[in-house]
Amino acid sequence: MKGKVSRNDRLNGEFQKEIYEIIQRKLKNPLVTEMFSITKVDASRDLSHAKVFVSIYSTDETKKMNTFNAIESDAKKIRYELSKVIRARTVPELHFFLDDSMEYGDKMEKLFKAINEGDKT
């Protein structure tokens, strides 16, 4: 079984790519002002629901939340557009989650650097 990719994994990858394209190129919501990426999509086995993790790159927390809320409010439009490009019997209901793992990683890296610099003195 080594090297085999499950149908669900393949669809998750397609969903991830297509959701980004739909938000960026088709919907063009003027409220999406910050740079973002779809970091992960996790669809249920029956494709009834999918968790969509969004990472938003912004130092302004208000703009970040406004961008996330704009993406989240377009969930039904995104699902409709997704149904046009994905070859699957059903397209999952999309649930968006803010992914702060990049920011957490940056904070940890800064902490480690500060610790290392403190050890040198």
Task: Write out the residue ranges for each language-model feature.
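Charge-rich, low-complexity N-terminal segments
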Residues: 1-49, 55-121
